[in-house]
């Protein structure tokens, strides 16, 4: 999905908020993917996140200063959290710890990340990542629902083996999935919003008799590309896969 060489985020400012979850290291790959699409990527880290991945990693990948300290004076703008919030076309907090989710849900702004997202009016995506018991805790679930009511889009965590040794929900989706969310949100004008599109892709088969059928060598790439484009433009897409050699979007 989105593996072809395209320049779809040129002129867009993407802000990534990285919190103290073990999945923080994966965001380096996401930042690199966004930079390859010519996005202006800015990373804000909590102090806890810096114990898991060095800010220099993000500065090297994005070419921008990684913001951590609210009172750091070594940057261009006078009120950086407000200036960056105004420039942002999209704000993604990933991985989002239970702590930061609670702060955002209750308007607490005590660091660079929470003050900036409080000032942002752009689309805001949040990808929770934590232990299963923490994620399923009623307090955390209430905070997630509250953020959804405030207009945040929550990215459902995957299920699987977690760093703590448990197996269950709470795993941050892979960078490709997060990248897809960003692309669908800001890459194109949503001129197909509200439309339902049905697409067939791949090598279809037409039966001749109980033994034989007519088919073709289609890989499904054309159907996949059309489905991808329609999704980016806001359509609700139903993709019917026949025998294909590519992954569906």
Report the location of each language-model feature.
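A cross-family phosphate/adenosyl-ligand binding-site feature
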Residues: 4-125, 131-220, 224-249
């Amino acid at each position: 999905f989105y593996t072809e060489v395209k320049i779809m985020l040129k002129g867009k400012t993407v802000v990534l908020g990285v919190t103290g979850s073990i999945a923080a290291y994966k965001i380096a790959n996401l930042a690199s993917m966004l930079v390859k699409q010519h996005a202006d990527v800015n990373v804000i880290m909590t102090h806890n996140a810096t114990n898991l991945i060095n800010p220099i990693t993000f500065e090297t990948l994005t070419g921008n200063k990684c913001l951590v300290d609210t009172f750091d004076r070594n940057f261009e703008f006078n009120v950086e959290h407000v200036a960056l919030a105004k420039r942002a076309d999209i704000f993604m907090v990933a991985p989002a710890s239970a702590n930061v989710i609670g702060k955002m849900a209750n308007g607490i702004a005590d660091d660079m990340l929470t003050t900036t997202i409080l000032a942002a009016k752009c689309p805001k995506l949040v990808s929770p990542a934590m232990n299963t018991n923490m994620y399923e805790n009623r307090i955390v679930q209430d905070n997630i629902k509250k953020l959804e009511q405030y207009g945040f889009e929550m990215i459902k965590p995957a299920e699987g083996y977690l760093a703590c040794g448990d197996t269950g929900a709470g795993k941050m989706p892979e960078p490709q999935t997060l990248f897809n969310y960003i692309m669908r949100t800001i890459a194109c004008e949503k001129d197909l919003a509200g439309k339902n599109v049905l697409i067939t892709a791949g090598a279809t088969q037409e039966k001749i008799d109980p033994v034989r059928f007519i088919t073709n060598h289609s890989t499904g790439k054309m159907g996949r590309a059309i489905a991808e484009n329609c999704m980016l433009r806001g359509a609700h897409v139903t993709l019917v896969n026949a025998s294909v050699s590519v992954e569906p979007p």
